[in-house]
Amino acid sequence: DLIREHLAAYQKAGISYVRDGGDPYGAGVLARSLAPEYGITYRTPVFAIHRAGRYGKIVGRAFSDWKEYCTLVREVRRAGGDFIKIMTTGILDFATKGHVTSEPLSREEVFAMTAAAHDAGLSVMAHVNGAQAVMDAAEAGVDSVEHGNFQNEESICCMAEHATIWVPTIVTVSNLLENGRYPAETLAWIFETQKKGLQLAFEKDVVLAAGSDAGAYGVLHGKGIREEESVMRKILGAENGQELEKRLAFGEKKIREKF
């Protein structure tokens, strides 16, 4: 019933394509089977893949060595996964400026994981935060970077150079700004870094796509994606509204092609 409720929320919001980020319970596979009833094309990696002891348990399964990673990639294929989702870093620490939880994967590991997924015929969605981690992911050839907080000009130019699709999920922070859950000053600082990152990415012609990270605290299914589009419009200004609409349409087209 809950999955149907979420699908109905997407339908009500006029959304016809949903790409989830994995889960350990099989919910995405069930949602994909039900989605056509709601006029929705649904894509799932079945489960996300993370290194044991690092962030990612909430959305998937862990590997301890290379053999285990390759086994998980094969399991995604056998389960009918539409793509591979890898977790290369932790998440934002909303109480500390500029801090990402969990040690990032090494550059060599990200390259190898991405290549193995592509060799299996599957595109790669990468959960990434931090400028160096974004550069590693883009240069490794991941197909999309999710979140991508705390970037700099070098990492943004790197995404542009490699035609990496960036899904910034700004709404995960903007929806927290006034609810008192985390320190207001820190949230405002994080949001400011997101604004600057989006503005620079827009200037550098990074391929942008709207995504909400729905299910995160304060981000509702269906409504979240419209809030993401709205906050992007506010950040870039009314004068860039039409161009942003074109860019997001192009980004969605590329997402649909790759995933």
Describe each region flagged by the PLM.
Residues 1-2, 53-71, 123-125, 185-187:
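Active-site mouth loops of central-metabolism enzymes
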Residues 67-166, 188-209, 253-257:
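Histidine/acidic residue-rich metal-binding segments in metalloenzymes
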Residues 1-38, 61-85, 115:
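Alpha-helical scaffold segments that flank or form the walls of functional sites
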Residues 119, 182, 192-259:
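His/Asp/Glu-enriched, well-ordered alpha-helical/loop segment
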Residues 168-188:
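Active-site loop ensemble at the mouth of alpha/beta enzyme cores that anchors a bound cofactor
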